[in-house]
Amino acid sequence: MRNNLPPYAVSDTNSRGRRIHEDPPIGRSQFQRDRDRVIHSTAFRRLEYKTQVFVNHEGDLFRTRLTHSLEVAQIGRSIARNLQLNEELVEAISLAHDLGHTPFGHAGQDALDNCMKAHGGFEHNLQSLRVVDVLEERYARFDGLNLCFETREGILKRATKSKAQALGELGERFLHGRSASLEAQLANLADEIAYNNHDVDDGVRSGLITQAQLEEIEIFARHLHQVKQHYPDIAGRRLVHETVRGMINTLATDLTTQSKVHIEAANPNSPDNVREMPTLVGFSDTIRQQQQELKRFLHKNLYKHYQVMRMSNKAHHIVEKLFSAFAAEPALLPPKYQHKFRDHGHQIIADYIAGMTDRYAIKEYRRMFAIIED
């Protein structure tokens, strides 16, 4: 990490620290330590077998939560460098932001949220925080990973007021309408850039959306035209890849340019000063509108495609059946979770299911409900 960060960037010296004090790391920054702890966590390894849109076994080349997190980190670090923000913090947040995601993407989250309605609901950002604060079991002195406040702040993108009240200092911004650090704001938008554009790539690869359909979307059509001008003979996968590449570059450049303008105008003098201001990291109005158009397109043509809806229906069924069985008879849980259920109730069932990979959830369903196992 550069030592000459501007005063509004988070650094080791202005960090609010860890919940449990530790001696400073040797040869690396506090946020490099956070990043390394995330990478070595069990939950991070599981992301390889948790999906974005397509169930893990549907195809080997589709993105998983792991590849998505790596892509978010790459985009975030590049923009952070141009904005003179703390790259290691952006990277740590980016790598950790999906640790609490359920199997089967958003379908799994929706199903688990429905199951948990009577018990406080389920939200993957809060679950990601729970993973790094409580569920990881690696260190002798504490549960979780004992990450810095600023990394945890970035993981927690949103929270209801009732949930925020239980989070102490971390939940204050949701109670008082404050912002997060610039690094947290950036990681959130790097996630958006990666998510939308890579779903375009996977959607075309799967055959569920076509290039012709995408040409109706302004941002895609413009970059497609530019690619064809530069490479008249390009076609197929390379054409789509170059188009998506151009879109990502445009979004990153726009985000950098607009954010610099906002930061220079606001002139914050510390991370805490940033937190008292409106959000400073953001797109131009034009790009924001084009992003929204792309989101609407993906929702209508990819996420609501009948084949994806069939996969989502299966995911709902698996999650709901597993939850109902464990809630009706906690003795069906593995012994480790049975002991915890006595003290923490249905949250432990949510922890168990949310920690499953796609493959493990399918296997557990078969073990529970198949008359004859494969």
Swiss-Prot record:
A Pfam match: HD_assoc
One of the GO BP terms on file: dGTP catabolic process
Keyword annotations: Hydrolase
Superkingdom classification of source: Bacteria
Residue runs in coiled coils: none
A molecular function (GO) term: dGTPase activity
InterPro entries named among the record's database cross-references: dGTPase, dGTPase-like, dNTPase_2, HD/PDEase_dom, HD_domain, PHydrolase_assoc_dom
Keyword Transferase: no
Keyword Hydrolase attached: yes
Annotated stretches, region: Disordered: 1-28
Chain ranges of the HD domain: 65-196
Ranges that cross the membrane: none
Family in the record: Belongs to the dGTPase family. Type 2 subfamily.
Record HAMAP family: dGTPase_type2
UniProt protein name: Deoxyguanosinetriphosphate triphosphohydrolase-like protein
